[in-house]
Amino acid sequence: MAYSYSEKKRIRKDFGKRPQVLEVPYLLSMQLDSFKKFIEVDPEANNGLEAAFRSVFPIASYSGTAELQYVSYHMGEPAFDVEECQIRGITYSAPLRVKLRLVLFDKEAAAGTVKDIKEQEVYMGEIPLMTENGTFVINGTERVIVSQLHRSPGVFFDHDKGKSHSSGKVLYNARVIPYRGSWLDFEFDPKDNVFVRIDRRRKLPASIILRALEYSTEEILDMFFDTTYFEILKTKVKMQLVPERLRGETAKFDIKGAEGEVLVEKGRRITARHIRQLEQLDIKEMEVPAEYMVGKVLAKDYANKKTGEVVGHANDVLTLELIAELSEAGIKKIETLFVNDLDHGPYMSETLRVDSSNNRLEALVEIYRMMRPGEPPTREAAETLFDNLFFSEERYDLSTVGRMKFNRRLGREDLSGDNTLSREDIVEVMKKLIEIRNGLDEVDDIDHLGNRRIRSVGEMAENQFRVGLVRVERAVKERLSLGDLDNTMPQDLINAKPISAAVKEFFGSSQLSQFMDQNNPLSEVTHKRRISALGPGGLTRERAGFEVRDVHPTHYGRLCPIETPEGPNIGLINSLSTFSRTNEYGFLETPYRRIENGSVTDDVDYLSAIEEGNYVIAQANVGLNDKGELTEDLVPCRHKNEFTLMSKEQVQYMDVAPQQIVSIAASMIPFLEHDDANRALMGSNMQRQAVPTLRADKPLVGTGIERTIAVDSGVTVVAKRGGVVDYVDASRIVVKVNEEEMVPGEAGIDIYNLTKYTRSNQNTCINQKPTVNPGEPVTRGDVLADGPSTDLGELALGQNMRVAFMPWNGYNFEDSILISERVAQEDRMTTIHIQELNCVARDTKLGAEEITSDIPNVGESALGKLDESGVVYVGAEVNGGDILVGKVTPKGETQLTPEEKLLRAIFGEKASDVKDSSLRVPNGVNGTVIDVQVFTRDGVEKDKRAVAIEEMQLAKVKKDLTEEFKILEEGIYNRARNLLLSNGFDEAKLASVDRSSWLTQDLGNEDAQAQLEQIAEQYQQIRDDFDTKFETKRRKITQGDDLAPGVLKIVKVYLAVRRSIQPGDKLAGRHGNKGVISTIIPVEDMPHDDEGNPVDIVLNPLGVPSRMNIGQILETHLGMAARGIGSKIEKMLKQQRAISELRDFLQQVYDLGESRQKVDITEFTDDEVMRLAGNLKAGLPTATPVFDGAVEEEIKALLKLADLPESGQIRLFDGRTGDKFERDVTVGYMYMLKLNHLVDDKMHARSTGSYSLVTQQPLGGKAQFGGQRFGEMEVWALEAYGAAYTLQEMLTVKSDDVNGRTKMYKNIVDNNLQMEAGMPESFNVLLKEIRSLGINIELEQN
């Protein structure tokens, strides 16, 4: 493959063997595509806003004299961009404007005559917009809407696994689940009658719903049963003979052939052989004794032909008397139902006997009573209710997906249809349920991913929007029916509040709208790819059983089997697999390579879980020869969710890549295939908690997906178009675009502004720094600037540490970690955290709070870091307790004596009635103020600091825009100059003319003149753009801020806190190997090798065997080899060897092993080789893809190439004594992460503080400045030691004995070291609770 200039800077050696068929798709496409569909203006769309409007409009008045129709909609432009919204704490959204048409009909004239039409554009609230990285900014914070995995609409057949009834009988049920509307359930009871439930209310016999659908008893029996007829002749009875129906029965009489020979004797079981005989003889009728008819069930009503009186009703059981009556009435042929116990049960016939209703009206009344108990039913009410349940589009929506699943389950060819139910639908569901009860079909598996679908942002937002619209619809209907509409416009009818409220509620407080996890780029991407089974319309943690949480065979390639949280949510929150995507119906699908006649093609098909079951699919690692043909005769495959061996001709598909089954977080773990799944789960979860370090360090052992994640996460700056870097500084990169990528008539300059030191949601630091230099060529997609945790465009969450696996004086007991002082000195694990502290000045009842530097009872020294407005300077270094913003609050008037009042009135003295309520630095925090922002309410005068900040912002904007303008202007003049030079002008002539007149020269050539005019137009356009941009920015900066009611001013102070590594911090590798730092040891005491190189970290070898995460050992060995290669290159550079030698060595390194990667060093220029070698000095970055990584031989070969022992173990010496350790130790490089569980955030101590009001016990937790809980088990411990006084002290004066506490304080002050324990307050609480039960308890007074 050809590498771009940027990619040649550092090439990762890839150990992957399988060729890449498919690029990893854009990781955030699920979120972006879903929201795009929601917001896209497409009149044909059947989803999104368009569908929501079309489903609610037109709205007609109750009388039908007026109608409000929907025409179209469009989204306006957002008022502020994303950054401004974050700073101001507002929502990034755009106004929605809808064109509506009010049509008035003439009351007097014929129906449908239009009297008047009015069209108008109506504002319908703000819709939050998605940023380009798939997040939403709501009230200034970035949030993510997590997709939901819910049960797909459609029909499901299931059984209760024999749990409902004591007999253990399996009861089958069917459930029709719509997208919205009432659920319809059919179920069997232990007596095998069929019942129906609507919305899980009380059950009714299933025949009631059939009667309500206007089916008679005869029709019902006809639909569910086959019939057998009997012919009554004078002396004998003949029966219709269908041989197949006799299977398994016992002959009640001799069955004879045509000649009278006995085929089956009485009492014998009828076998398949007998049935074949009867079929060959082709007998249509057979003589039976009359008693044989007894117990059969009539299929029709039979009436006396003469009198018309009904003798036998349908579903009546035949008795000898009834047979005689029928025969007397002249009825010769009787049709009966065919039933048997095997596969034609009498279920519906029995159900009809339970059913008390006889006609449609009675059935409707019965349903009405069940749905609305206690209301008197009328015919109209009952009919309306029943029609609205399943047959009205407003109340019931099966949705396209639901209809597709419904038709597919019932085995229909056509998968489309109405989104409401029909008579046939209901009958077919009942037929299918009875088929399943008869053993002719299987029940469904509800955990199959073909029965669970994904609801993404767009769909959930659309549902909420529709909820708002329906509320509006009710109000509009009311208004259309009131008063005169002649002077009414559409705007007067619509109130946008309910819509805004519904949308706002969804984005602000829905369970699936979550505060974005922004620890590092990986955690952002993973959060956006998360799939949750919780949330509205989903499961709840408590009710979810083991089956739902389990890994299902259909998860393969769709949901990751590894990445899920530990704890109560395990298995309910999943992560999308690497290549997975959703199809048009919302089901997850995964790509497979097509195989034809045993050879693999490059065609890739995406299959959903339903389709996948029908194919035979081989693994990604199946053996292939050079032509792409399968080599093995028997191939391990997946078919119908089972693993089997198949011959190679039967194989139809194979996986596209080995890492297809895992999520991106799991595919970041090298040697994942050697780790136990539980540890891999911890590994993938802990990578998301890594804090970005001060200097990112790429992993020496990676998996090759690091670049994809870094680029797709959006934290890096990526070139939109190719070109040459023109200018670089810390906050901006300018690229001159290549001619061929330019749009005709544009300046051809791309300007990228970088983010500097901003705060993330988790208080980590977001900062971008350029990776390119002026003059370097860039191609589209190259990384121009690194963000947090990225290094040259690759994700870099931690640091490569030199580790040794050995015990060291008990300091690494039980997963503790011993680290070297050098790690702290070199700031390897130092992180920067940015905290935002707010000070709000409100308008109180007693007067306004004031931000000022004049604070009562505070010394000069405490105000040293504040300016005259009372706000801290930028750059001040502050510690816990320092004042950041001075603020005073008016105190309530104290009772004054008349003399004081007089003095006050004369001198206007007011100073004493304010109290200090300043913003102070929290305890234990010390850092540097890096930014201050002041927001002032409209109409409140800005203080000096606010004005200064405003001026600074304006100056910055002006400087930025001016520089931008200069760059673009330069580009314009360069193009004009080239045009003039190629049309007869020379350098001297151009130099003599003023630059501004270049654009007005006469060239005497029409084409060239047109080009020059176009350039001049562009120049004018750029100037105009500059003016409008500046004006817009100026207006935004100078206008007052929209603050919450009662707030006059907000000051935000940003503190940067630098945290070095220290004992108590949590470190982890990528294999679930986590630990806490026990101590930091001086470099000279650490174990070192022969050359005196000390190790950075000492880990306990006992942490490996029981955890079964051997991946960490392989990583250590490969890391050692990678570092050894780097050292060798460094030596060659130091010795200034010939560049050909360096080329040969690099070629040898990249060619090692059976890799798919082909790097041809001969294609590199000498400069490029030197730059590559320079970047490899610290170690050769390697990639060992998941399930396709480096094998033992390759690691050994690389170790050998680096002149290191192939065992991966070396001699170490004790740094304190200089003695050699007893045996060789495994030493190598492991990638270690610093997790966001820092001891500084957890360390906490209190002597006295706040107490709970009721129990008078200290509060708990660091945030409340609480005490330590002395719990039940701790009490036992003291009891066990018999430490009575200590225990008494713990339970009284140290806890909730109020008088004892104060007395204790006094005693300590008086140096009288005694204590008296009184009555604990919690005992009084207990007494009061018992009294509240009406039991009086009084303490004996002693």
Swiss-Prot record:
Gene3D superfamilies: 2.40.50.100, 2.40.50.150, 3.90.1100.10, DNA-directed RNA polymerase, beta subunit, external 1 domain (2.30.150.10), DNA-directed RNA polymerase, subunit 2, domain 6 (2.40.270.10), RNA polymerase alpha subunit dimerisation domain (3.90.1800.10), RNA polymerase Rpb2, domain 2 (3.90.1110.10). GO terms for biological process: DNA-templated transcription. It catalyses: RNA(n) + a ribonucleoside 5'-triphosphate = RNA(n+1) + diphosphate. GO terms for molecular function: DNA binding; DNA-directed RNA polymerase activity; ribonucleoside binding. Keywords: DNA-directed RNA polymerase, Nucleotidyltransferase, Transcription, Transferase. The keyword Transport does not apply. Pfam families: RNA_pol_Rpb2_1 (PF04563), RNA_pol_Rpb2_2 (PF04561), RNA_pol_Rpb2_3 (PF04565), RNA_pol_Rpb2_45 (PF10385), RNA_pol_Rpb2_6 (PF00562), RNA_pol_Rpb2_7 (PF04560). It is an enzyme of class 2 (transferase). The keyword Nucleotidyltransferase applies. Its EC number is 2.7.7.6. Coiled coil: none annotated. GO terms for cellular component: DNA-directed RNA polymerase complex. Belongs to the RNA polymerase beta chain family. DNA-dependent RNA polymerase catalyzes the transcription of DNA into RNA using the four ribonucleoside triphosphates as substrates. The RNAP catalytic core consists of 2 alpha, 1 beta, 1 beta' and 1 omega subunit. When a sigma factor is associated with the core the holoenzyme is formed, which can initiate transcription. This is DNA-directed RNA polymerase subunit beta. The gene is rpoB.
